[in-house]
Amino acid sequence: KDLIKSLPFKLTDSQNKVLSEIFSDLTNPNQVMNRLLQGDVGSGKTIIAILSCYLAHLNNSLSVLIAPTEILAQQHYQNFEKILVSLNVPLFLLTGSKKIDLKKIPKNAIIISTHAIIYQKAHLDNKISLLIIDEQHKFGVKQRSFLNSSTKLPHCLTMTATPIPRTISLTILGN
């Protein structure tokens, strides 16, 4: 709540409702979240992702946001950094050109990545508690199936600005 109060803008009623639902899912030990967050470009999906990852951080859990391109991953990283910089949240960027040693990541970190993390996922298997996928339909079939191959399924939030039937069916059916 302190982070929300410190934001330089007020969340909309819709954002507050979505956050309440996501926070309820993330704190319910009897359920694994699998949600689709659809909104136009600029509608505030990123702040929902930031606040959701921050809740995971506060609960000493690892969260990962995966973006389809390096440019989008860098934009997300910069947005997360702006909001979280004063809170000493361990924040990492992993792309094809920016490597990190996943074995040394604190368990309460936030990782922003491209599909590059998929190929190093073995180091994180069963450690990710929240997985946020931005524009899932832009990932290939092999990449999506690899993301879902953990023995312990994390909470999953899929964000999209493209309400196409394929995205909706992928989220509902999980394949």
State each model region's role.
Residues 56-64, 84-86, 153-155:
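Post-Walker A helix-loop "phosphate-sensing" segment adjacent to the P-loop in P-loop NTPases
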Residues 62-72:
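Conserved RecA-like ASCE P-loop NTPase motor core of nucleic-acid helicases/translocases
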Residues 39, 114-115, 134-135:
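Walker B catalytic acidic pair
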Residues 1-64:
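Pre-Walker A segment
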Residues 72-99:
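Conserved helix-turn-beta segment of the N-terminal RecA-like "Helicase ATP-binding" lobe
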Residues 74, 125-130, 136-175:
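Post-DEXD/H (motif II) to motif III coupling segment of the RecA-like Helicase ATP-binding lobe
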Residues 35, 65, 92, 110-111, ...:
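Hydrophobic positions in the central parallel beta-sheet of the AAA+
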Residues 94-111, 118-128:
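Conserved motor-coupling elements within RecA-like helicase/translocase cores
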